[in-house]
UniProtKB/Swiss-Prot annotation:
Binding residues for substrate: M35, R77, L115, E156
Top-level enzyme category: lyase
Name the UniProt record assigns to this protein: Chorismate pyruvate-lyase
SUPFAM superfamilies: Chorismate lyase-like (SSF64288)
The keyword Transmembrane helix belongs to this UniProt entry's keyword annotation: no
Function, in words: Removes the pyruvyl group from chorismate, with concomitant aromatization of the ring, to provide 4-hydroxybenzoate (4HB) for the ubiquinone pathway.
Length: 165
């Protein structure tokens, strides 16, 4: 099962450099902290609608080519992050199977827990980059993050109800 928001997320086209945008947009798109926390700061109750969690082959995560190690299996998690029940963000996390050793195995068992609640409590979290993307009227971003040096790719699409707009 997929969702129209995830189709739009996969259609994002990324800028080669950070574009000259309004400060308000850049404030959201370049946020280095947890988007879950940012939504909660808006006075909202944040919840996750889980669309898909499964191991997939390389052909289902082509956007990760060149950004993550080439492996036969990846853990894929697709969600909608909702504020007071309204979808504000679509998220897609691609995790190489080799990342899922040690404490990082918990990434397979997040269920309806927001990814940010786990990632941003880890003292081993680093971010290699943030790229800004756009699909028609919607903005998004992707980041390669590392836990204990092990990579994962997080792509986020800001939906029309999001305060980014």
């Amino acid at each position: 099962m997929s969702h129209p928001a995830l189709t739009r997320l996969r259609a994002l086209r990324y800028f080669d450099a950070i574009p000259a945008l309004e400060p308000h947009l850049l404030d959201w798109l370049l946020l280095e902290d947890s988007m879950t926390k940012r939504f909660e700061q808006q006075g909202k109750r944040v919840s996750v609608t889980l669309i898909r969690e499964a191991f997939v082959g390389q052909s289902e995560v082509e956007e990760a080519s060149g950004l993550l190690p080439s492996e036969s299996r990846y853990w894929l998690r697709e969600i909608l992050l909702c504020a007071d029940g309204e979808p504000w963000l679509a998220g897609r996390t691609v995790v190489p199977e080799s990342t899922l050793c040690g404490p990082e195995q918990v990434l397979q068992h997040l269920g309806k827990t927001p990814l940010g609640r786990y990632l941003f409590t880890s003292s081993t979290l680093t971010r290699d980059f943030i790229e800004i993307g756009r699909d028609a009227t919607l903005w998004g971003r992707r980041s390669r993050l590392r836990l204990s040096g092990k990579p994962l790719l997080l792509t986020e699409l800001f939906l029309p109800a999001s305060p980014l707009y």
